[in-house]
């Protein structure tokens, strides 16, 4: 029987219910979506996603994501640790918020917290998701997964640790806003989210990355 750990967190007079989204043993509760085309760079010799020493590990190929089976997360605080476990010059990944579970493409309709080292904590609207007041780079075309991307870059210096070290990422999603903190430092604050609920996703986008201690506190 699958078990989740639930506990209550008192915060500013409100009680939030928290759950560990990853049990540290297997990928129960998660669904993988991947691009197996040539552009995905699929390496058959290694699994895209695996559990290694209590962490979710991805090789970064093929491109795609691992999402929660639950797809109605609305307002919450999400905390997790991540590290780049195998070095590349510009490792890339991200975490998807309010991801539409009916998206079948390797880039979903969602908001992305960027983890790529040069732009960590930047926020993107993907796959037709809307950030009010932020114009997309190109008009959205459902036939083109890379179209319609809107971005709010991080405007302060990164607080990310060196390659191979664990980082603590905290994101608060509440109403139309998202606030990102990395290792205790607020790096970005964005308003204008129009999608109000969805799944949570971990991205495979070329970077060899690990995630652990993934805890979500739902807000009232």
Q: Where in this protein do the model-derived segments appear?
A:
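Carbohydrate-interacting regions of secretory-pathway proteins
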Residues: 18-220
């Amino acid at each position: 029987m699958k078990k989740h750990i639930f506990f209550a967190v008192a915060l500013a007079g409100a009680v939030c219910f928290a759950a560990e989204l990853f049990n540290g043993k297997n990928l129960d509760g998660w669904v993988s979506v991947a691009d197996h085309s040539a552009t995905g760079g699929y390496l058959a010799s290694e699994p895209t996603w695996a559990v290694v020493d209590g962490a979710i590990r991805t090789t970064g190929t093929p491109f795609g994501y691992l999402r929660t089976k639950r797809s109605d997360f609305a307002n919450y605080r999400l905390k997790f640790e991540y590290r780049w476990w195998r070095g590349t010059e510009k490792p890339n990944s991200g975490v998807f918020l309010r991801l539409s579970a009916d998206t079948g493409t390797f880039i979903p309709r969602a908001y992305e917290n960027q983890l790529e080292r040069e732009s960590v904590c930047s926020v993107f609207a993907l796959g037709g998701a809307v950030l009010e007041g932020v114009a997309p780079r190109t008009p959205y075309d459902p036939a083109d997964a890379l179209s319609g991307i809107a971005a709010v870059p991080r405007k302060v210096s990164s607080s990310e640790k060196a390659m191979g070290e664990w980082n603590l990422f905290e994101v608060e999603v509440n109403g139309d806003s998202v606030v990102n903190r990395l290792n205790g430092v607020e790096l970005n604050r964005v308003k204008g989210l129009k999608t109000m609920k969805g799944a949570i996703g971990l991205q495979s986008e070329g970077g060899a990355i690990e995630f652990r201690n993934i805890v979500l506190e739902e807000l009232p």
